[in-house]
Amino acid sequence: FNVYSPDQKASGPYATAIANWMQYIRQGKAPFITGDGEQRRDMLNVQDAVLANLFAMNHEKNFDGAAFDVGTGTNISLNEVRDIVKEYFPDVEFDYTEPRKGDVMYTKADTKSLKELGWKTTIPIKQGIQECFYNLKEKKPC
């Protein structure tokens, strides 16, 4: 799943579209979307990723090495993320490029196990993305 942060670096194999787009906007360049933008991603704010780990670490139940999906349990298309960005940067034009070979078109965390234990995300996808680009527009530290 895609963990994002307003301070995430846009380099490296795990950089999210959000981090890349923020960097391009800072540089006055057009952000790009690979493919048609209908890829759907479960995007999790880094604060929620940390809280989920702390929750599991401090939970009374012994998990015996069980794996849990940590995400929002919902997803958003890259085109929908683009629309949120354009709320803050209406003049930014996005370029579309060829799809990446092997790109996954749909991700969504199965959050049932964590929900049964009482954990849930605190930052909805749209709100977290809005905060990233609001801070970028206002040139506020994140």
Features from the language model and the residues they span:
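Short, conserved glycine- and acidic-residue-centered signature motifs
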Residues: 14, 18, 107
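Flexible, glycine-rich beta-alpha linker
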Residues: 1-15
